[in-house]
Amino acid sequence: MKLFTPVLLAGSLVGYQALAQPINDDPTGPQPRLPTESLLIKTTAGKEYNFTVELPTTPQEQATGEMFRTSIPADQGMLFVWKSPQVSEMWMKNCPVPEDMVFIGAGGKIVAIAENTVPYSLSTISSGVPVQATLELQGGITAADDINVGDQVIAKALSGR
């Protein structure tokens, strides 16, 4: 037991140290491609659009987001799912291409859209109301596809929210 306690304590401290690693809020390059899933947007006009979205789940992945990526394909994006509904506040630091930010409320309904956000801007882009997720898409795609507030977003990551 005398050896077990120090070994257990040392193991706990190593685990705690790994959890306590600071978030690098000033990365210098794009993060590797993250795990993906399919996402469907159903418009109130009856149109359907399919996207493949990356899922940043760790604080570091969420902080880095689309930074330094020089393009976002029209059928791809990034879905930030929050642990609980919150006012989503984003920015375009180190993002060289415009994005459409789609703010998703309860039941997967789109509650706000910020179109063609300004590359590299440090201005806050806010959902204005608590949302369960934020979807980043290629700038201009929501207007081109006539995606609007009130449309439905369906994705496994949003299930049960």
Role assignments for model-derived ranges:
Residues G15-Q17:
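N-terminal signal peptide c-region/cleavage motif recognized by signal peptidases
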